[in-house]
Design a protein with these regions (language model features):
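Conserved active-site tyrosine of GNAT-family acetyltransferases
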Residues: 136, 141, 164
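A short beta-loop-alpha structural element at the N-terminal edge
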Residues: 7-21
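Conserved GNAT acetyl-CoA-binding A-motif
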Residues: 112-125
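Acetyl-CoA-dependent GNAT
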Residues: 34-94, 105-106, 111, 167-168
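Helix-loop element at the rim of GNAT/NAT acetyltransferase active sites that forms part
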Residues: 23-39
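Conserved acetyl-CoA-binding loop-helix of GNAT-fold acetyltransferases
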Residues: 91, 97-114, 133-138
Length: 168
C-alpha cells in the first residue's frame, strides 16, 4: 500500500524519540552494508550520539506518531573546512519506497544551510546502495569519483564507495 508523503513530517529529535530512533539506526548498522559503524547503540550511547550532532531530524507519521526515519547532520571537518557538512540517513525497512528518504535529504539540505554550512558531502555512499545513488543524482548531488573497495561489508568482502557533494 502506497502511503502519501503528506502523512509524514520532520522534527528535531526529542528524548522520547530515542528508543525508536536507536532501533532504526541499529537495524542499518546490523545489516553491515550502508553505515560505517560496527557498534550498536543503547539508550545511553544513543542519546549521547544523537545529541552530539549539529542536528538530528526525525521523520514521523502524523497520524500514528511512529518514527519512520531519521538523519544526522554534523561538520565533515574542522577549521578551514568546517563549512562542509556531512549527513547520514536511515529509513525504517518497512517504510522504504514511500519517499521518506527524499523528505529527509531535502530537510537536511535546508537545515544545513540554516546552520551556516556551504556544502553537504557524503564520504562513503556504498556502491550497492542503489536507492541512495539514484536519489542523490535526482537531487543534484555530484559524484566525486570511486574509492575501490572502500567499505568493508558485514560478510567480510569489500565494496566501492562513491563520495558525493552538493553546494548549499
Amino acid at each position: 500500500m502506497k502511503v502519501s508523503i503528506m502523512n509524514y513530517k520532520i522534527k528535531q529529535l526529542e528524548k522520547s524519540d530515542i528508543k525508536q530512533s536507536i532501533e532504526i539506526w541499529n537495524d542499518i548498522v546490523s545489516d553491515g552494508i550502508a553505515f560505517p559503524q560496527t557498534e550498536l547503540l543503547n539508550e545511553e550511547t544513543g542519546l549521547e550520539f544523537f545529541n552530539s550532532q549539529s542536528f538530528t531530524g526525525i521523520a514521523y507519521d502524523k497520524n500514528s506518531g511512529e518514527i519512520v526515519g531519521l538523519y544526522i547532520l554534523h561538520p565533515n571537518n574542522i577549521g578551514r573546512c568546517g563549512h562542509i557538512s556531512n549527513a547520514s540517513y536511515a529509513v525504517k525497512k518497512d517504510k522504504r519506497g514511500h519517499g521518506i528518504g527524499e523528505l529527509l535529504v531535502k530537510n537536511c539540505l535546508t537545515k544545513a544551510k540554516e546552520l551556516g554550512f556551504k556544502i553537504l558531502q557524503f564520504n562513503a555512499v556504498v556502491a550497492i546502495n542503489t536507492s541512495a545513488l539514484k536519489l542523490y543524482k535526482k537531487l543534484g548531488f555530484t559524484q566525486l569519483g570511486v574509492i575501490p573497495k572502500g567499505f568493508l561489508l558485514k560478510d567480510g568482502t569489500y565494496e566501492d564507495i562513491i563520495p558525493h557533494y552538493i553546494e548549499l
